[in-house]
């Protein structure tokens, strides 16, 4: 394997790689048919679990007052494909990935997923080199600041409710206007949000968007997701 690439990866990950062939596998897509060392798929499977565990551990320590529901939402936001792909781009990993000819013009979600997979495969390599302690510096370097930024202020309630609902089983919140009143220049909307398996809530506002947000906030508070919310967090 190219020594400058190894040196660059060791600087980026703060880890000394012990198995060059395994590292090479982590950077090889399954579309490379003539590859003798294999591809990153098995490593990605392992790395996904290691990442989830270490992010859960980090969140548990960073947010001692957060409920289980809030921790789950934060976890989902930090281990999803987009976050991992963003970190891959930050590290310059796309230029190091070995792909087959037909994959070189990949775009959109499939490209995002591939970049995320390589991050997870890289995590697996570090874990196999030296266990969880070998991965923690890498997690701190790229995920800790992101985790803290998530706490700088509440995200949009609808976005947070959607992520929480996904954690609960993949269902999506459904919003519908149940009442509209008032004059055209000063309308009042009442919107109901429902999630399969949970009681609905109704929000009220001067626009559909505002009413939807208020309904979403009610669910987040009721389910304990925003249990630690301060009085100004939603302003």
UniProtKB/Swiss-Prot annotation:
Keywords (A to Z) from UniProt: Cytoplasm, Endonuclease, Hydrolase, Magnesium, Metal-binding, mRNA processing, Nuclease, RNA-binding, rRNA processing, rRNA-binding, tRNA processing
GTP-binding among keywords: no
Domain of life: Bacteria
Cross-referenced CDD domains: DSRM_RNAse_III_family, RIBOc
Active site positions: 48, 120
InterPro entries documented for this protein: dsRBD_dom, RNase_III, RNase_III_dom, RNase_III_sf
A GO cellular-component term linked to this record: cytoplasm
Record-level GO BP terms: mRNA processing; regulation of gene expression; rRNA processing; tRNA processing
Binding site for Mg(2+): 44, 117, 120
Cofactor(s) this protein requires: Mg(2+)
Subcellular localization: Cytoplasm
Record domain RNase III: where: 6-131
Gene label: rnc
Reactions the enzyme catalyzes: Endonucleolytic cleavage to 5'-phosphomonoester
Protein name: Ribonuclease 3
Annotated family: Belongs to the ribonuclease III family.
Domain DRBM span(s) in chain numbering: 156-225
EC number per UniProt: 3.1.26.3
Subunit composition and interactions: Homodimer.
Family annotation (SUPFAM superfamilies): dsRNA-binding domain-like, RNase III domain-like
UniProt keyword annotation of Magnesium present: yes
Role description: Digests double-stranded RNA. Involved in the processing of primary rRNA transcript to yield the immediate precursors to the large and small rRNAs (23S and 16S). Processes some mRNAs, and tRNAs when they are encoded in the rRNA operon. Processes pre-crRNA and tracrRNA of type II CRISPR loci if present in the organism.
Species of origin: Bartonella quintana (strain Toulouse) (Rochalimaea quintana)
Phylogenetic classification of the source organism: Bacteria, Pseudomonadati, Pseudomonadota, Alphaproteobacteria, Hyphomicrobiales
